Design a protein with these regions (language model features):
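Active-site helix-to-loop segments that bind/position phosphate- or nucleotide-bearing substrates
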Residues: 1-71, 75, 185-188, 211, ...
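Conserved active-site and cofactor/substrate-binding residues in soluble primary-metabolism enzymes
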Residues: 20, 58, 82-85, 89, ...
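Generic amphipathic alpha-helical segments used as scaffolds and interaction surfaces in large
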Residues: 9-12, 69, 73, 77-85, ...
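Short terminal or interdomain "cap/linker" segment that borders an active site or interface and mediates
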Residues: 105-181, 188-190, 211-223
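Internal, well-folded beta-alpha domain core
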Residues: 73-131
Length: 223
């Protein structure tokens, strides 16, 4: 909660309201992370990387819409910021999962629009049919709290925290920018809302694994 207050420039008297909204929204989060291993090609030149898709699910969107439709615009904005922090926790757990399972270290989170163009997204989303995340003609994902990014990896241990997104982001004018320092290729894996990594039914013949939502957000209370 304190991190959200600082990062998104809320007044201190909003602490209680933000904490309450965190409590209300967390049970509605159906966080899922998917990734597909790729090698360098003519369009993306990383030697080895994962195409990653992270989503909070549809219920979180509906909660934000409910507040907005009832003209509770401050609360809707707070929920949007809370959702961004939930997404950040999901990125962190996905990177840790890949490191633990494959002994590969992520070198950066590469969001489309920086090194590679946004119009690549439609083609990359073809890897994730059947996940419930859709893309429209404007390259917007639904549910809205869904993000696709590239995770280049190395066999050498990385000391830097690749999930410090501001470190690698080219938008130096962002109002929320934080100060720096303050198995088979093409198989799809899933991290979703069950308590541990398990085998799961194949999706179009592609094997997957799962990771729990409570594992993603454990020990986050009060931060």
């Amino acid at each position: 909660t304190n991190k959200i207050i600082r990062k998104y420039h809320f007044a201190g008297e909003n602490t209680g309201k933000i904490a309450s909204l965190c409590d209300v929204s967390l049970p509605l989060v159906s966080a899922a992370c998917y990734y597909v291993w790729k090698k360098a090609d003519t369009e993306i030149t990383y030697d080895e990387y994962a195409v990653c898709l992270v989503t909070l699910g549809t219920a979180f969107d509906k909660l934000v819409d409910l507040y907005a439709e009832n003209n509770c615009l401050l609360e809707a904005y707070m929920l949007d910021c809370i959702g961004l922090e939930f997404m950040s926790r999901s990125y962190e757990q996905l990177v840790k999962h890949i490191q633990t399972k494959y002994c590969k270290w992520g070198t950066k989170l590469d969001f489309l629009g920086d090194a590679y163009p946004v119009d690549m997204m439609a083609r990359l989303m073809e890897n994730f049919t059947g996940t419930g995340v859709l893309i429209n003609d404007e390259m917007m994902l639904k549910p809205l709290k869904s993000v696709l990014f590239l995770l280049p990896v190395s066999d050498q241990e990385e000391k830097a925290d690749v999930c410090r997104i501001c470190t690698n982001c080219g938008n130096v004018n962002c109002m929320f920018r934080e100060e720096i320092g303050s198995e088979q290729q093409n198989s799809i894996q899933k991290i979703s809302s069950i308590p541990k990594i398990n085998s799961m039914s194949k999706n179009n013949g592609i094997p997957g694994g799962s990771y729990g939502i409570r594992q993603i957000f454990k020990n986050e209370g009060g931060k």
